[in-house]
Swiss-Prot record:
Residues 24-50 form a propeptide. The keyword Transmembrane helix does not apply. Belongs to the neurotoxin 12 (Hwtx-2) family. 04 (lasiotoxin) subfamily. GO terms for molecular function: toxin activity. It holds the Pfam family Toxin_20. This is U1-theraphotoxin-Lsp1c.
């Protein structure tokens, strides 16, 4: 009976140590999280507009029609994979990604 009690106590203490260390790590990470109210809304608006433009570009490109929406530059009209948008947005695999 003693062995079972000792094992149970050791297991509980290990779980407590693991839980405490995980909670401390999570608390440390919370300091690095961005709070939505603290961001610059003007910058978010510009990024949203660029994302919309690039999504629009990818949709048109998917249909096979030529396109050059506002803010997007086309290096090579024949090569669809090299079409880039200003601000770090690129069309890749019919998706728009920010680099």
């Amino acid at each position: 009976m003693r062995k079972i009690t000792i094992r149970a106590l050791l297991l509980c203490s290990l779980l407590l140590v693991f839980h405490t260390s995980a909670a401390a790590e999570l608390q440390a990470q919370e300091g690095h999280l961005m709070i939505p109210g603290d961001t610059d809304t003007a910058l978010e608006t510009v990024d949203d507009e660029r994302f919309f433009e690039c999504t629009f570009e990818c949709d048109i490109k998917k249909e096979g029609k030529p396109c050059k929406p506002k803010g997007c530059k086309c290096d090579d009209k024949d090569n669809k994979d090299h079409k880039k948008c200003s601000g770090g947005w690129r069309c890749k695999l019919k998706l728009c990604l920010k680099f």
